[in-house]
Amino acid sequence: MSDKQKNVLGEDLEECSNNPLTGWFRDGCCNTDENDHGVHTVCAKVTTEFLEWLKEAGNDLITPHPEFGFPGLKDGDGWCVCAMLYAKAVDADKGCPIFIKRTHANTLKHLPIEKLKKFAIDLS
């Protein structure tokens, strides 16, 4: 039996991004635990519009912070974003594409699978 965390489809969670290195644990995956109060579980392929919306919402992921090893994000980067903020972005028509197979199952506490599938770019 696999000890990997699960995605929203009930399958093993796939890697989101290792360049830039993402995830609550900075392991490249949108893994989570009880200490992840931001619920960094949505594997997004960020867009400029989404990043600008996030910055206006108080979560600046554009500005580099080398002291934390954070390069700043740009259009097309993969990143584990906060499920609650992503839900707000969707409600504001600012949601960006996501990799649903790389999005953690805990995301379903904040967004229904039907909404997530509308933004998924990795479903056949």
Segments predicted by a language model, with ranges:
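Extended boundary segments
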Residues: M1-E49, I113, A120-D122
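Short, basic/aromatic beta-hairpin or loop at an interaction surface
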Residues: K45-D60
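Short, compositionally biased
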Residues: Y86-K109
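Glycine- and charge-enriched low-complexity intrinsically disordered segments
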Residues: H104-S124
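Short alpha-helix capping/helix-loop boundary micro-motifs
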Residues: I62-G69
